[in-house]
Design a protein with these regions (language model features):
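Short, Lys/Arg-enriched, disordered terminal segments
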Residues: 1-2, 33
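Asp-based phosphoryl-transfer active-site loop
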Residues: 2-18, 92
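Flexible loop residues that form catalytic
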Residues: 10, 67, 163
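Active-site phosphate-binding/coordination module
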Residues: 22-127
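Conserved acidic, metal-coordinating active-site core of Asp-based
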Residues: 95, 99, 106-184
Length: 184
């Protein structure tokens, strides 16, 4: 008997326009009605989970931040976390400030980004639905490194976006000394 179904969201359950079909919703509802745990699994933070998914009756848990956290959706509390310690995250942000890219940190189910870099990321050659999602779902900070110092929370995930493969490669070279402790 099937006990659990894990579902990737973007590009799988949701199409490239970030929409879910009625057919997919019905299949998810049917599985949940049969007592099967339906578990969305995504790179998104808790706050970035699509409303259309959360409104489907019978979904009680979600794997978020690429496995950085598992949430009980009824209580909105993390029941598991595998975080990057705050000090390490601050070091990485400091190092990555030298590249032309968007650095994001996910803390307690929310994604934070530096305002100036978020604005610049809108010029990257990415799909319009993706850019809209990023713009709408990020909490903007004047200075991400200072925010990490003030917040003190551990980081469920770090996400990087670049406008060019050259900058991406530069960033990977800069964080190479940290890779033993990270999933890159």
């Amino acid at each position: 008997k099937i006990k659990m179904i894990g579902l990737d969201l973007d590009g799988t359950v949701f199409n490239d326009n970030k929409e879910i079909s009625e057919e997919n919703k019905a299949a998810i509802r049917e599985a949940a009605a049969q007592g099967i745990i339906v578990l969305p699994a995504t790179g998104r933070p808790l706050r970035g989970l699509p409303k259309a998914m959360l409104e489907i009756e019978g979904i009680h848990y979600a794997v978020t931040s690429n496995g950085g956290a598992v949430y009980d959706l009824d209580s909105r509390k993390a029941i598991y976390e595998d975080c990057i310690p705050n000090e390490e995250a601050k070091q990485l942000v400091s190092v990555l400030n030298a590249v032309d890219g968007l650095v994001e940190v996910y803390i307690d189910g929310v994604c934070y980004a530096q305002q100036s870099r978020l604005e610049h990321a809108l010029t990257y050659p990415l799909s319009k639905p993706f850019l809209e999602y990023i713009w709408k779902s990020r909490e903007r900070q004047e200075d991400l490194e200072a925010f990490l110092t003030a917040d003190g929370g551990n980081v469920q995930k770090m996400h990087l976006l670049f406008g060019s493969t050259k900058e991406r490669q530069r960033a990977f070279e800069m964080i190479a000394p940290y890779e033993a402790d990270l999933a890159v």
